C-alpha cells in the first residue's frame, strides 16, 4: 500500500449542441490530463524505523510509480427525453487522440533482511511504457502537426453513458459511466523492462580477508558482485506498441430540491487503478444565495479516510459563470493530507433565458 497523488485537468476547447424535439445532439473537443504518482509507504517505513528489530524478515517494497495519460477527445453525443420528460438517457462516442503517456506496468523493488543471517535480498521487476512526442524533445519530433495534435498512429475510441430520472418534482436520480475505452500507442514509443523479471540477489557481505590476503582474489570477488547486480537490475529498451485504458469512472447519485434555493445530494463514485478498486461516497449541500452567488459543502468517505470536507463557490454574472470547488480541506490543515482535489472553471452560456422560459412553460402545462 502506498500514498498517492492524483492530478486531473479537463480543458473543454469546444462544446455545442442543438435540440430536435425531444432529442439533443452535441459535439465537443476536450483535452484531458490524468496523472497519478505513487509514493511507497515502505520507503518512509525504512527511513524512520530501519530494517532491524521487528522489521527483520519484512519485505520492503519500494514500488514508486508514475502514470500520465494526456489525450484529446472529439465527441459526438446524443440524448433523448422520455416518459413525459422525466427520463433522459444518452451517450457520447469519442475518438481519442493520444498525445502523451507514461504508464508504470510493473514497479516492484523488494528488499528483505534475513532475521538469522542478516543477509540482504533484493528482487526487481520493472516495466514502464512511454510515448511522449510532445514533451520529449530528444525524440526529434519536428512535425508541428504531431506537436499540436499528436500522432495519428496514437489513437483509440471511448464511450460515455448516462441517464437521469425525475422520481418526483423534487427528487432526481442519476447514473453514468465515463471514459470507457482504450488508446493504442504505435508511434514514438519506448518500453523499458527488466531483463530478468523477478531476479533475486542476496548479499551476505564481503569477506575482508579476501581483500587483505589476496588482492587478485578480492578484485575477482568484487567484479563478480558487480556482474550479479547488473544482471538483477539490467533493463532492456525497445519500441514496441502498447495500449492503455482511459481510466474509466462511474457515478450513481440522487438529489433532492428542498426548495428553490437549497438542495441536498448523495453520490457514489468508483474508479479502477492498477487492479484495485477505489470507491467514495459523498454527501453534499448546495445553496443559491441570491441571483449571483452559490455555495456548496460536502463530506466524503473513501479509502483514504473519513475526514474529507469540501467547499465550493460559484458566481453567476449573466451568461458568464465562474466556479471553484475543493475537498479534503481538513487534511490540508492537520497534516495528514493524502489526496486533494481542486476544480475551477468558467462557462459561457448561450440561449439560457429562452430555454428556461420554455422549460417553465412545459412544467406549468404538465401541472394543469
What does each model-identified segment do?
Residues 1-368:
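Subset of outer-membrane beta-barrel
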Amino acid at each position: 500500500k502506498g500514498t498517492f497523488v492524483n492530478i486531473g485537468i479537463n480543458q473543454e476547447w469546444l462544446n455545442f449542441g442543438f435540440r430536435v424535439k425531444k432529442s439533443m445532439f452535441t459535439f465537443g473537443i476536450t483535452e484531458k490530463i490524468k496523472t497519478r504518482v505513487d509514493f511507497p509507504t515502505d520507503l518512509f517505513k525504512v527511513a524512520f524505523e530501519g530494517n532491524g528489530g521487528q522489521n527483520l524478515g519484512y519485505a520492503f517494497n519500494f514500488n514508486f510509480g508514475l502514470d500520465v495519460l494526456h489525450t484529446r477527445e472529439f465527441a459526438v453525443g446524443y440524448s433523448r427525453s422520455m416518459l413525459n420528460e422525466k427520463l433522459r438517457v444518452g451517450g457520447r462516442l469519442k475518438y481519442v487522440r493520444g498525445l502523451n503517456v507514461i504508464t508504470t506496468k510493473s514497479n516492484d523493488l523488494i528488499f528483505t533482511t534475513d532475521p538469522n543471517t542478516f543477509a540482504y535480498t533484493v528482487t526487481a521487476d520493472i516495466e514502464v511504457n512511454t510515448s511522449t512526442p510532445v514533451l520529449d524533445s530528444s525524440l526529434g519530433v519536428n512535425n508541428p502537426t504531431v506537436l499540436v495534435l499528436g500522432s495519428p498512429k496514437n489513437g483509440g475510441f471511448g464511450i460515455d453513458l448516462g441517464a437521469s430520472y425525475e422520481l418526483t418534482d423534487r427528487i432526481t436520480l442519476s447514473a453514468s459511466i465515463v471514459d470507457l475505452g482504450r488508446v493504442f500507442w504505435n508511434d514514438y514509443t519506448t518500453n523499458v523492462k527488466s531483463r530478468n523479471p523477478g531476479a533475486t540477489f542476496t548479499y551476505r557481505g564481503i569477506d575482508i580477508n579476501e581483500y587483505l590476503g589476496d588482492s587478485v582474489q578480492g578484485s575477482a570477488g568484487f567484479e563478480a558482485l558487480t556482474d550479479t547486480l547488473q544482471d538483477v537490475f539490467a533493463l532492456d529498451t525497445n519500441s514496441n506498441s502498447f495500449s492503455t485504458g482511459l481510466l474509466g469512472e462511474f457515478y450513481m447519485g440522487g438529489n433532492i430540491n428542498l426548495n428553490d434555493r437549497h438542495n441536498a445530494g448523495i453520490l457514489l463514485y468508483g474508479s479502477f487503478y492498477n487492479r484495485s478498486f477505489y470507491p467514495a461516497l459523498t454527501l453534499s449541500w448546495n445553496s443559491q444565495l441570491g441571483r449571483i452567488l452559490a455555495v456548496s459543502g460536502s463530506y466524503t468517505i473513501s479509502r483514504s479516510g473519513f475526514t474529507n470536507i469540501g467547499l465550493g463557490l460559484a458566481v453567476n454574472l449573466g451568461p458568464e459563470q465562474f466556479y471553484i470547488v475543493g475537498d479534503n480541506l481538513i487534511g490540508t490543515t492537520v497534516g495528514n493530507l493524502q489526496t486533494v482535489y481542486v476544480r475551477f472553471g468558467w462557462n459561457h452560456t448561450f440561449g439560457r433565458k429562452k430555454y428556461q422560459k420554455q422549460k417553465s412553460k412545459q412544467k406549468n402545462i404538465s401541472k394543469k
